[in-house]
Amino acid sequence: MPDYAKKNLSEVEDSAVKHGFSETQIARFAGGDLGCERIGLALEGVKPGRRQAFGHRHEEDEEVYVILQGEGRMRLGEDLIEVGPLDAIRVAPGIMRAFEAGPDGLELLAFGTHHEGDGEIDPGFWED
């Protein structure tokens, strides 16, 4: 295997479909397709006017999110911030987070360190 890998993110399986969240979001986790061992990469999307179906956090992993298209909000613990194109947001381990899209939807890249099994999901994290 060469010392590099290339994959078009549109060709990566959408895990949101597989897990029943396709009504609200898109989640294409590319780390496995790229053969990543210590980092993770995902193309994520939130459909117009929708919110991710759950919040999540990591105990060890640090993540950076880069907004590619659209505007919306991101909840980080108890904080709520506005996000838009080319905003980069670093999230330290332990912080619960989720995105909400504006009327045009939201597309973003998520990347960071990766430790297998290091993730907690909270479906009730961001309720009205």
Where are these regions (language model features)?
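Conserved short histidine dyad/triad with adjacent acidic residue
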Residues: 23-29, 42-58
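Short histidine-centered beta-strand/loop micro-motifs
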Residues: 31-33, 52-58, 100-101, 124
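Short, conserved beta-strand element in jelly-roll/cupin
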Residues: 43-46, 57-75
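Short beta-strand His + acidic residue motifs that chelate non-heme Fe in jelly-roll/DSBH
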Residues: 54, 74-75, 91, 97-103
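A generic "binding-loop/recognition-motif" signal
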Residues: 60, 79, 95, 104-105
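Short acidic-glycine-tyrosine-enriched beta hairpin
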Residues: 78-93
